[in-house]
């Protein structure tokens, strides 16, 4: 029997919550007999359940929770690259390609993902000689009105605003920046993926926005083209973003490991966890997927993966030339 016939995906919506809803969703999955945990999508919710999956010794494989604390336990591995790597890579790209020298930053101080990238970016920016002229924060309780943050960046002459945040808040910042007559360059990370798909957002404001992402839907390789075609057919012609691609790679990686480790459904979740940990860190294991080739994992749960720099052009991603 083919491996896909032996995999049963069960979903619970935790509503991007970093508290009780995330824990309740995890407990519901566990009560339904979960043997492998492919989750969560966001960092805050992942941090809410990592100790529970460790206590249960269930293998946890997160597609896109990128904080280093997510993989503090030995049962959790990331498909995405870590926040420090994104922050460092962003500062390096901006400095090495002379994109700008005077930088403003707007980040979510209440979010581990955003704060982690910001802290790494700040450290590397200093090492690269970039000037952070404005460092502005907001929290989960104040994420709709960005007029003060935008005004500070504008008044201090920011040539580029770095946005280590998610696309929902980025769309508001772009809209409010236009209304304030502020038109700097904007640069973000994988959280900006999906910016052009937000309902009721003037996507023309996203033109020229730069970001680092492991996946670009307009890539010409056959695997990406096949995935995009199938995804659009399944989801009302919606273009997949890196969140979808990371999750897809996650399922394929697990399938490969299940085969190589000879894992069967009658094994306990704990036994499966031990086999998956051994398999994914084995010297001879690697994976070529949508979000990178030759992917390998260390015992700390980190994946070796390099982000791609892209710019939004005509509503699509285009590779940024180095």
Give a label for each model feature.
Residues 1-322:
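Extracytosolic ligand-binding ectodomains
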């Amino acid at each position: 029997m083919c491996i896909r016939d032996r995999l049963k995906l069960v979903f619970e919506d935790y509503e991007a919550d970093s508290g009780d809803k995330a824990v309740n969703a995890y407990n519901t999955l566990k009560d339904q007999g979960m043997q492998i945990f492919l989750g969560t999508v966001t960092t805050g919710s992942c941090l809410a359940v990592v100790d529970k999956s460790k206590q249960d010794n269930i293998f946890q494989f997160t597609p896109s929770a990128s904080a280093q604390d997510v993989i503090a336990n030995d049962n959790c591995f990331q498909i995405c690259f870590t926040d420090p790597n994104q922050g460092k890579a962003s500062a390096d790209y901006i400095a090495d390609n002379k994109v700008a020298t005077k930088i403003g930053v707007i980040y979510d101080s209440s979010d581990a993902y955003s704060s982690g990238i910001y802290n790494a970016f700040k450290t590397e920016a200093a090492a690269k000689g970039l000037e952070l002229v404005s460092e502005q924060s907001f929290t989960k309780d104040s994420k709709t009105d960005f007029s003060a943050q935008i005004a500070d960046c504008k008044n201090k002459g920011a040539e580029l605003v770095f946005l280590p945040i998610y696309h929902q808040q980025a769309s508001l910042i772009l809209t409010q920046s236009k209304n304030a007559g502020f038109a700097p360059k904007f640069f973000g990370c994988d959280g900006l993926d999906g910016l052009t798909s937000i309902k009721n957002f003037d996507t023309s404001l996203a033109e020229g926005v730069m970001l680092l992402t492991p996946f670009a839907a307009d890539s010409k390789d056959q695997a990406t083209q096949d995935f995009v075609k199938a995804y659009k057919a399944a989801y009302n012609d919606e273009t997949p973003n890196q969140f979808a691609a990371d999750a897809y790679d996650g399922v394929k990686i697990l399938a490969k490991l299940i085969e190589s480790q000879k894992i069967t459904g009658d094994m306990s979740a704990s036994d499966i966890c031990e086999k998956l940990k051994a398999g994914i860190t084995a010297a001879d294991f690697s994976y070529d997927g949508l979000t990178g080739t030759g992917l390998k994992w260390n015992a700390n749960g980190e994946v070796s993966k390099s982000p791609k720099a892209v710019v939004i052009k005509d509503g699509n991603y285009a590779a940024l030339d180095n």
